[in-house]
Structures are given as structure tokens and as C-alpha cells.
Swiss-Prot record:
It catalyses: cob(II)yrinate + 2 L-glutamine + 2 ATP + 2 H2O = cob(II)yrinate a,c diamide + 2 L-glutamate + 2 ADP + 2 phosphate + 2 H(+). InterPro entries: CbiA/CobB_synth, Class_I_gatase-like, CobQ/CobB/MinD/ParA_Nub-bd_dom, GATase_3, P-loop_NTPase. It comes from Streptococcus sanguinis (strain SK36). The a and c carboxylates of cobyrinate are activated for nucleophilic attack via formation of a phosphorylated intermediate by ATP. CbiA catalyzes first the amidation of the c-carboxylate, and then that of the a-carboxylate. Pathway: Cofactor biosynthesis; adenosylcobalamin biosynthesis; cob(II)yrinate a,c-diamide from sirohydrochlorin (anaerobic route): step 10/10. Gene3D superfamilies: 3.40.50.880, P-loop containing nucleotide triphosphate hydrolases. Belongs to the CobB/CbiA family. The lineage of its organism: Bacteria, Bacillati, Bacillota, Bacilli, Lactobacillales. This is Cobyrinate a,c-diamide synthase. The keyword Iron-sulfur does not apply.
């Protein structure tokens, strides 16, 4: 089995570009490629899936702190694949705080036992690149740095200069490069790359990127260095559900942030998933419960407001006591109002208050939460790990039901409250991965059964 991680020396070096190019080039060769993403990102995984035609999976060691559960989130999915490609997050050793082994790409690579290919930015550098590679290669002797790929290289001559320096001063093999004009830069906005569903020319960009990758990166050598013994493991989770349930979930251009593992976990527990569109459908489908994931309701605020019949059906389901769970963009939709650039749009109105878009991030990163009331997560005092990433605030006088903290290097660096519960509707900015604790999902299913 061929497995490797692509990790940058920092954010912004072109790690995602290189990853997409390699995914495309390998897929063009006929390989079945299983992609993964370290950390909580939803958008990169959608790009991976677009190329490989396989759902990309998040491998997140903060939200999934148990090593067995973390390994399951990785090994479960590539048994029928030829190659597993893992895209790192931020810089190789960047994680939570200053501990290089806390939620970093490096720590996950060591836990999984896979080699790392380092991505560096070749723009305006030559021999200094060797010092950078040397530092990364020697910083953690337990980490296998199998090679380096140089991004944004000006010319073949420039590549030979950097390659010569790295191979003169380090033992790390240079596997190739991408030229600075390999493809037009992928556009982004406040939450990172623009989602693939909003890109009209994405497949053409992928074709260009795949061709440049095949031309300039030694894929044969990369795959040689990535060959590892097959490893299989058994499912560490023990929960079960004998009662068939139906969960309808929002899935369209406005709402599409879901962890694939969460959806598959639900399916494995006898839950039928039914997608619906708050943009296009006239009413909610019949279901035992409803799930509104994150996304970009602010981009589609006019269309969401215009679909008044659908909004009314959501509020009716709430009033009838149907369990509703919403994360981030889902919270914004279930609120009363959404303000974008001075324009105010009516939303569902389950929670009184207004979501207001902000110029900067209002919350970013991992956090630990504790429920202050009995909820779908379980009894009061239930611990939940999650991730927040939003350019908005929810201005409301509704009571909060979560106590949240951000902890770095053992110290609480921020504390706040959030999350709202009214009847059987629960909404917060927190994105949650259920592999962290199977009991959270068991509690949610019990909560749904009690309501029905």
C-alpha cells in the first residue's frame, strides 16, 4: 500500500495546490486514490473529492484524541485504494500551542507511521532553501521526511539551483517542483478557498495542474518511497442501534459542511440520511430529526429569505417538537435575521436575534465545550470537543447552553459561552466530529427516539 503525507513548512506555501496536482496526476494514471486532510477543514476535502471521485476524510487528532479512533478514521477507508494521500495543515509542526506533538501534521504522521513529503516555496530563494529543509528534517528524528517538492519555481534553471543546494547540504531527496504558473491561483474569501460548488472552471484548472505535476514531479520515485506494508484494524466503536431512523440534512450550495465520517457513522447505525435544500425545496421532508450543517448562508441570504415556505416548514417542525441540530451556518439560518453588508434578511426565527457578518474572524480554532443543560449531546456537564471558524456573531438575548474554552500548552487562553437550545432545537457555532466519543452519537440517537 502506497501512503504519504504532503506537509508544508508553513501555511501559504502551496500545499493544497501541490496536493491537488498529485491527486489529479495519480488519478489520470488510473490509480484509485484515497485522499485525507489533517485537521477540520471542509473545503479542501471537497476539492480532493472532486478529483478522486472518493469522499476525502478528515484525520483530526484534537477532535479525535483517542489513537485507536484516530487510526480508524484513516485505515478504514483505503483498503480498496492503490494510494493514500494525506494533506497536512498549516506548517508541519504547527498544532495547538507550541507542543509539536499536539494536533500537528507531524504528530499524525508519526501516529499513522507514514512518510512525509515536505512542500517548500521556491519563490525568490536558492541555497537558503537547504537550511530550511535541513531544519525540518532534523527537528524530530522520529519523523520520516521522505522527500521535498518545491512550489512556485521560476524556471528549470532555478529548480536545478535549489535542488543542488538541498542535495548538497541535506540527505533529503528532491522529488520535483511546480512552476509558478502551473495554474491560476485558486480564489479564496473569508473562510479560505471558495467551495468547489461555486467554481465554473475548476475541472480545467485541475487538468492544467495535473499535467504540470506529471511533467515536473517524479511520481514514480514518490510512489517508491511511499510503499508501506498493508495494515488492517478492527472497528474500535461498540455502539449499535436497532431502531431504524430517518435524519434529513441540509445539502446544497448554502449548506454543505459535514464530516463524511459523521454521515457514514450515522448510516452504519441504521439511520437513513435524506438530503434537502433550503434554497430550492418548498418544505422539509418527513423525518425523525433534522441536521443543518455549516456553509455560506451569507452568500445565499437573498435566496434563503425568498424561500419563505421552506423557512415556515422548518419553524413548524420545531414547534411540533422535532429534534433539530445545527452547526455554524445552520445556527445563522435558524436565527431571526441575517445582516450582510448592511442588508438585513429574514431567516427561520426559531432563535430571536441577528447574525451579523464581521470583517475579521470572531472565533477561530479548536475549543473544548461543556454543556450547561441536558441536550442532544447528553446530560448537563457533557464534554464536547470541536472547532469554530466564523466571520459572524449572533446577537441575541437567548440563554447560552455551552461553556467553551480555548486551551494552549495547558493554559486557558480564552473562555466564552455559546450555543442555544429551545425545545428540541439545538444550535451553536461548534463543528463536532463524533469519532471523539461514540457516546455523543449514541446520546443523539436516544434523544431522537425519545422525541418520536
Amino acid at each position: 500500500m502506497k501512503q504519504f503525507m504532503l506537509a508544508g513548512v508553513s501555511s501559504g506555501v502551496g500545499k493544497t495546490t501541490v496536493t491537488l496536482g498529485i491527486l489529479k496526476a495519480l488519478a489520470d494514471r488510473g490509480y484509485q486514490v484515497q485522499p485525507y486532510k489533517i485537521g477540520p477543514d471542509y473545503i479542501d476535502t471537497a476539492y480532493h473529492s472532486r478529483i478522486t471521485k472518493r469522499p476525502s476524510r478528515n484525520v483530526d487528532s484534537f477532535m479525535i484524541p483517542d489513537d485507536q479512533s484516530l487510526a480508524w478514521s484513516y485505515y478504514k477507508w483505503h483498503g480498496d485504494a492503490d494510494v493514500a494521500v494525506v494533506e497536512g495543515v498549516m506548517g508541519l509542526f504547527d498544532g495547538l500551542g507550541t507542543d509539536k506533538d499536539c494536533a500537528s501534521s507531524a504528530s499524525v504522521a508519526k501516529k499513522l507511521g507514514i512518510p512525509v513529503v515536505l512542500i517548500i516555496d521556491g519563490k525568490a530563494t536558492s541555497t537558503s532553501a537547504a537550511a530550511m529543509v535541513h531544519g525540518f528534517a532534523t527537528f524530530d528524528p522520529d519523523l520520516d521526511i521522505a522527500g521535498v517538492i518545491i512550489n512556485r519555481v521560476a524556471s528549470q534553471t532555478h529548480f536545478e539551483l535549489i535542488k543542488g543546494a538541498i542535495e548538497r547540504y541535506t540527505d533529503v531527496e528532491v522529488l520535483g517542483y511546480l512552476p509558478k504558473n502551473a495554474t491560476a491561483e485558486l480564489p479564496s474569501r473569508h473562510l479560505g478557498l471558495i467551495p468547489d460548488v461555486e467554481m465554473d472552471d475548476l475541472d480545467r484548472r485541475f487538468e492544467d495542474l495535473g499535467a504540470a505535476t506529471a511533467k515536473h514531479i517524479n511520481l514514480d520515485r514518490l510512489l517508491e518511497k511511499a510503499e508501506l506494508p498493508d495494515k488492517r484494524m478492527t472497528n474500535p466503536f461498540r455502539i449499535s442501534n436497532d431502531q431504524p431512523l430517518t435524519l434529513a440534512y441540509a445539502l446544497d450550495d448554502a449548506f454543505h459542511f459535514y464530516y463524511e465520517d459523521n454521515l457514514d457513522f450515522l448510516r452504519e447505525l441504521n439511520v437513513q440520511l435524506v438530503p434537502f435544500s433550503p434554497l430550492k425545496d418548498k418544505e422539509l421532508p418527513a423525518a425523525d430529526a433534522y441536521y443543518f450543517g455549516g456553509g455560506f448562508p451569507e452568500v445565499y441570504a437573498q435566496e434563503l429569505m425568498a424561500n419563505a415556505d421552506f423557512r415556515a416548514s422548518v419553524k413548524k417542525a420545531h414547534e411540533q417538537g422535532r429534534p433539530i441540530y445545527a452547526e455554524c451556518g445552520g445556527l445563522m439560518y435558524l436565527g431571526e435575521l441575517l445582516e450582510v453588508e448592511g442588508q438585513v434578511y429574514e431567516m427561520v426565527g426559531i432563535f430571536k436575534g441577528k447574525s451579523l457578518m464581521t470583517p475579521g474572524l470572531k472565533s477561530f480554532g479548536y475549543c473544548q465545550a461543556e454543556t450547561q443543560v441536558d441536550s442532544l449531546f447528553g446530560p448537563k456537564g457533557t464534554a464536547v470537543r470541536g472547532h469554530e471558524f466564523h466571520h459572524s456573531v449572533f446577537e441575541t438575548e437567548e440563554d447560552t447552553v455551552l461553556k467553551l474554552e480555548k486551551v494552549r500548552d495547558g493554559q486557558v487562553v480564552a473562555a466564552w459561552t455559546g450555543g442555544y437550545q429551545k425545545g428540541r432545537t439545538f444550535a451553536s457555532y461548534l463543528h463536532v466530529h463524533f469519532y471523539q466519543d461514540e457516546q455523543l452519537l449514541a446520546n443523539w440517537l436516544d434523544y431522537i427516539k425519545e422525541a418520536n
